[in-house]
């Protein structure tokens, strides 16, 4: 039907006859001449119909979002009427004929006025929202990114192999989406949270290099960067080590950013241990564009009478830190400090102490804060020296249980960085390594990544003889601008070590056999050293397109309650279907 897309129409086609198809984006009547902006996925082109044209009445009857096909001759626009904002802006099409393919009702919101439209409305009419050039750009970028990744992995010897969607429920952290079996009454499949076990089994099978662009499912509480169904770039390889995975993935991600948005990353990426990340930034996914670091002042506060600081300073499970904001006296108002105090409270902090440094020459008198009177001058100036604080700087303090301080002050660091625009570069990719093997909660051990991550031991004897809380894992995360975009590890390839890890996690031998018997069996049949990584496609595209909402980069996303406003999923099903599955629905008591 068409000969050209809108973006193809330029001055090189002057005098040529073309056919375009698309939507009427805008219609204008100037002195009896009809101007139509025709939109397709590549952009806009201007179509002009003069009153003496046989199709003038048809052109005059067009309204926004009518779908049309038009023929005409490409002409240079009159001098001074060029539009530099569109690729076809130097030319226009003088219309010969036009055909209305389909009319449109008045759309629920104007594409140019989307910011004043509620997200619920945009999600209900997603097919309208996706007509916006901004949304089309994001999904086109997604397509380009996935194409690049496929080509890279194909060219590096990885095989695209599909794994099952109907699989066995296994305890991986989040709740599974369950699918009842009609043939096996009372039994359920689970939609996979990841292809973890299947990709490891492919390594046992000898495929050596695997990848898959795959949907995964987690029935968990949602936030701005989470969806119940999401897409992973899933990768696994045999006879390799951490260095192979990290260097190969650096090349892939650096190439991806250069190919899609023209950004060049220096390689190799910075590498930081988990312990350093937590110590300096309170987070295992720090945004290194923000030049703010924690300074540990625990020892300095141990002998002070100020219990807010000395209490945590003498508690092995707590920490005391300072965070210096250069020029913070002028940049941060009292109102902002009050807001930050409320902000850290979200993470469990009981308050937010601060000191304004007005004058260093005046000693304690030059420091402004409600807490200054409670701390000795010697200690105050030790802290000032440690933090390299200068006049007009402001110091924030975190004191309390280690997790609360890390979470609250880590979040505060990121918020201040954004509020004051402290970013000293556009991009900051890094690897975080040497994660703890386990984390403890409610007096029980949990896998920090997943139960198949290899510990940094060579034998089951080493595993038995090491305090589990001191074990490091062979895991690695890729972080870009404070987002964890990918995570992986070298896997356990020996059956006895895998069985012992299950045991340390409180999984009995019987439960391990029931849930993972097939995996334990496979590990006894000659399993190679192997490892891999998975990247969140949705998060990567968020970074590539500069959005903070994951729903912007998915064609048909769910809401934060995991519903689809357009199709009204989830929905009820008939009693007949439920009976076939042997399911009775228990009505929620109100």
From Swiss-Prot:
Its EC number is 6.1.1.23. The keyword Coiled coil does not apply. L-aspartate binds at residues 172, 218, 449, 491. The keyword Magnesium does not apply. GO terms for cellular component: cytoplasm. It is found in: Cytoplasm. It comes from the Bacteria. GO terms for molecular function: aspartate-tRNA ligase activity; aspartate-tRNA(Asn) ligase activity; ATP binding; nucleic acid binding. It catalyses: tRNA(Asx) + L-aspartate + ATP = L-aspartyl-tRNA(Asx) + AMP + diphosphate. Residues 196-199 are annotated as: Aspartate. InterPro entries: Aa-tRNA-synt_II, aa-tRNA-synth_II, aa-tRNA-synth_II/BPL/LPL, Asp-tRNA-ligase_1, Asp-tRNA-ligase_1_N, Asp/Asn-tRNA-synth_IIb, AspRS_core, GAD-like_sf. GO terms for biological process: aspartyl-tRNA aminoacylation. Keywords: Aminoacyl-tRNA synthetase, ATP-binding, Cytoplasm, Ligase, Nucleotide-binding, Protein biosynthesis. ATP binds at residues 218-220, 227, 484, 536-539. Gene3D superfamilies: Bira Bifunctional Protein, Domain 2, GAD-like domain, Nucleic acid-binding proteins. The record marks 30, 80 as: Important for tRNA non-discrimination. SUPFAM superfamilies: Class II aaRS and biotin synthetases (SSF55681), GAD domain-like (SSF55261), Nucleic acid-binding proteins (SSF50249). Homodimer. Aspartyl-tRNA synthetase with relaxed tRNA specificity since it is able to aspartylate not only its cognate tRNA(Asp) but also tRNA(Asn). Reaction proceeds in two steps: L-aspartate is first activated by ATP to form Asp-AMP and then transferred to the acceptor end of tRNA(Asp/Asn). NCBIfam families: aspS_bact (TIGR00459), PRK00476.1 (NF001750). HAMAP family: Asp_tRNA_synth_type1. Belongs to the class-II aminoacyl-tRNA synthetase family. Type 1 subfamily. This is Aspartate--tRNA(Asp/Asn) ligase. It comes from Francisella tularensis subsp. holarctica (strain LVS).
